[in-house]
């Protein structure tokens, strides 16, 4: 039986293998430091105890340790009791072993206790005996930090830490010469050395450097090289014009390095140049997330998973205690820096980033985390191929600076392709339907103490939305000031989803039953509704005369009354009074089609059923989901696949309505009860607030790549379709081959980057043949 938390081998992968186990606070020789301070450390509710014990009497007599009660009854069943704190209203924590000890024989005992994770586990001779499921973990009140007090028997190799260590660190290795963690650690180091010895190009003095696919689904942790690492010793990236593209670099210490950083040169292609300052270098910050991290948007509060997630310039902005599984944010006050724990489930967060001095550096800063062999750090380098960029191969170098000295340089090759991506992709079934990128349910994005700061923050948010192909989001178009800022950034909507909803007219007559309402009542209600909403009808008609304006009518409704009767007259009014007006609803299934297909101009739903897409496309209307996944999973591959190729080809959906983007304050602490909002959900987060702006994440990069995949594939389909009647037989046949290739994609099994590369090659061939025919 494996432990669900501390006993499972999988937990070891969730917590760092690279951090060595610290010295214990208590051994047979006594406590390290003042006894009161040691007791206070254990009373925080996080500790681990391991020892070998021989009971010379059953039932046992005396104390194995004064910290907690460890006894054995007359049958040899071990009992562990953790006394509750005097101020606690909980009961003492008690658990028992399933196996039995024998009098006069040596047995290995190990016990873990964690209030943070609400888990406790008991091991006997390396086997899990108990782990709590529903039993509450009290705030403890431990006793004296002594060993074998008046104990009838012997205790040796006693160790106690004020940390709830995972099982591998407190269980003995098969040879008894260390812990199971020691064995894994040695094997990891040996495997790392073997891989690097076989790939000497990746070695640069005190560090090794490899590259990876930035949207790969493998987590890059701090304890080894990724399985799909590229050891070529070069950074290579390509992008079409009007596209952002990332490169991923992983730096591993071959010897202790006190300080490390990357320095990029300018990139040149003939007379054209990309300044180094235009390439944003950020490190991937690993921190603890709740159970479900990386894979799902459902939460398990008792797990803590070390997860690559945030993109930051300053590693010290967030400190992570990898053994105690805690996250700390840095606040720069006038009188000095302070770090605040944002991972305690028993503490909420009641401050606002509008006023708190929490902000990342503007450029990449040196790191101090490569202090031991095998420790690594992942970096993202974000390149931008502008619309007017000269195509060609831009070359430069990436300098590796370790302890102030150049450890080596890597060649950097950035190829800008000779074509421009369309601003938006289009539906696989209907090129007239644009692939929708919409974000709803985000917090306010105009943070700042002054108007200038608030405007700068808003423009930064609008800019990142545009750069990540999210061209429509709540809270933007209905505000004249924000809309003006969007125009400054160059974000001009061709469609928008408006949160305003006209209430059903029947509510204006609360004293009448539905079957008592008359046509005169309806006319009166419509006149009232038109007057009530005239201002915003005029606003949208004036500000966005050419944009399609989708008005939301009800959310998650599936009854006939809500979907048809309540919407019919309101929809007629909206279409009469607003130019290019559209109506839609959040629905839970196919009933939207049956009940309101004649009213609505598309649908937003949870299902990814291809049949639903076929139905709405038969009317020439769009359909897109707002879930599967929600915004929570940190895995960029999941975001890239589900929001891009899989949506576009496998489900034939027309985009996404992302349910969540910018973190509310409590989202920094995923273990607080309110973090996920309604339902058993994790934080619906892609961006994190800081003073005057926000921090991006690798899953946000995955969203951008999802939409870029669709832009590439839509461009290929448009070019191929246009050449089906080409006079040149080679061009006509190549166009057919491209369309056959697109049709044969199922959107679920292919590697996304492989599809991207193949699409680029087919676009280039079509362009070459078209130019040849034009001559």
What kind of region is each of these model predictions?
Residues 597-676:
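Catalytic-core region of carbohydrate-active enzymes that cleave or remodel glycosidic bonds
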Residues 525, 529, 533-562, 567, ...:
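Catalytic domains of carbohydrate-active enzymes that cleave complex glycans
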Residues 129-160:
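Flexible glycan-contacting loops in extracellular carbohydrate-active proteins
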Residues 32-89, 103, 118-119, 155, ...:
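Extracellular glycan-recognition modules
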Residues 268, 287-289, 303-308, 313-371, ...:
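Aromatic-lined carbohydrate-binding surfaces of glycoside hydrolases
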Residues 106-113, 122:
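Short tryptophan-centered beta-strand motifs in secreted/extracellular beta-sheet-rich domains
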Residues 197-254:
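Beta-sheet-dominated interaction scaffolds and their linkers
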Residues 21-24, 28-29, 121-123, 154-190:
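Extended recognition patches within non-cytosolic domains
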